């Protein structure tokens, strides 16, 4: 499935609800560098308690799997490392949600996101500096060489315009 289709499945409900989010991971890499395959969308989110119910209601249909409210609430309370996903069953596409918690890099993603238009949908994408640092962290923590290829691609396409102070 083209990444624009993944965006069409998951981003419009977030925008309609006014959810504070930033796209990270493979979709962000594609936006800041060369096309590559991805089968999900990764999102850093800040969801106050009442917003959790709205998010789950937006994906409450037979076409989506969403975790129970209690699971999402528990993941949102974690100071770091929280995670839950919502899956579009017919296409097997998924959105991985990462609660911002206490991670300053996630805070930067939510504060300094950049708006991009993809497939007719406006999405908030974490700045390339955040993507570079996060990809390096994932590689350090045992990730694949794909993370390094993604970093190289971002540096090749947007390297001169990166905020080097933000990378420090």
What are these regions (language model features)?
Residues 1-168:
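Compositionally biased terminal segments of proteins
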């Amino acid at each position: 499935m083209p990444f624009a289709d993944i965006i069409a499945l998951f981003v419009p409900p977030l925008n309609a609800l006014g959810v504070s989010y930033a796209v990270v991971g493979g979709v962000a890499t594609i936006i800041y560098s060369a096309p590559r395959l991805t089968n999900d969308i990764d999102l850093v989110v800040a969801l106050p308690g009442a917003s959790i119910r709205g998010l789950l209601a937006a994906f409450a249909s037979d076409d989506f799997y969403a975790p129970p409210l209690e699971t999402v609430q528990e993941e949102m309370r974690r100071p770091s490392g929280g995670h839950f996903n919502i899956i579009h069953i017919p296409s097997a596409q998924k959105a991985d949600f990462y609660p911002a918690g206490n991670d300053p890099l996630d805070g930067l993603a939510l504060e300094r996101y950049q708006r991009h238009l993809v497939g007719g949908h406006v999405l908030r994408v974490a700045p390339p500096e955040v993507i570079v640092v996060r990809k390096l962290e994932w590689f350090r923590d045992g990730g694949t060489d794909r993370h390094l290829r993604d970093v190289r691609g971002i540096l090749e396409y947007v390297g001169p315009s990166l905020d080097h102070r933000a990378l420090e």
